């Protein structure tokens, strides 16, 4: 079953995860206007879109909703606030009628090591290095970016990457730069939360997460 889960975050907010597969056709879950548009898209884009609409239907029970985008590129649907993310193999949606929401998902990969300096300051990298050293004393005591064989380091970096992507989406109208966000990951477990800051406006947001051997997922509301 492609549906991995639907989680009720609170009475107003639902989070869903879908495993992308080629089992559905566009006309089974997508509104007709979306089906027409998808004919011009590549096969990968079609599969991702079908997964998103299948998950949207599973969460809301509706097949008439059409996903649009506002001027900031943020997805929109009638009657809900929505955030969407997809990565290789998975699609995720979070929706709420009253709350602003954001979600991000990333499959496990080592690309994150190559872009450490892009999204983390030296201070943030040093904080992660101390966290990993404390949680796993046998981990290599080298530069974060070179610890490609350390599972804990990969997890920490992916959590921070997804958290900043989530914060960017949450404050989409501000178009935050990576150095205008600060992440403070203090522990790593299968599920949890940690503080993240919008430095531009001095706002703190708790980012919730779940992670396993396949992916890392973060969200906020």
Model-predicted regions and their roles:
Residues 141-142, 147, 154:
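Charged/polar low-complexity intrinsically disordered segments
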Residues 1-136, 150-221:
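Core catalytic alpha/beta fold that binds nucleotide/phospho-ligands
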């Amino acid at each position: 079953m492609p549906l991995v889960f639907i989680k009720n975050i609170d009475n107003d907010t639902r989070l869903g995860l879908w495993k992308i597969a080629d089992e559905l056709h566009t006309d089974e879950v997508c509104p007709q206007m979306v089906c027409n548009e998808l004919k011009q898209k590549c096969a990968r884009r079609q599969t991702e879109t079908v997964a998103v609409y299948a998950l949207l239907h599973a969460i809301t029970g509706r097949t008439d909703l059409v996903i649009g985008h506002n001027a900031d590129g943020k997805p929109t649907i009638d009657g809900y606030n929505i955030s969407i993310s997809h990565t290789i193999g998975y699609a995720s949606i979070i929706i709420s009628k009253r709350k602003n929401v954001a979600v991000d998902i990333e499959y496990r990969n080592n690309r994150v090591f190559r872009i450490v300096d892009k999204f983390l300051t030296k201070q943030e990298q040093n904080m992660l290095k101390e966290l990993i050293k404390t949680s796993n004393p046998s981990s290599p005591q080298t530069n974060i970016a070179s610890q490609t064989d350390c599972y804990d380091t990969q997890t920490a970096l992916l959590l921070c990457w997804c958290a900043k992507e989530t914060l960017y989406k949450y404050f989409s109208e501000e178009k935050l730069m990576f150095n205008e966000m600060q992440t403070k990951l203090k522990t790593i477990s299968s599920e949890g939360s940690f503080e993240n800051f919008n430095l531009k406006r001095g706002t703190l947001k708790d980012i919730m997460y779940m992670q396993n051997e396949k992916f890392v997922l973060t969200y906020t509301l």
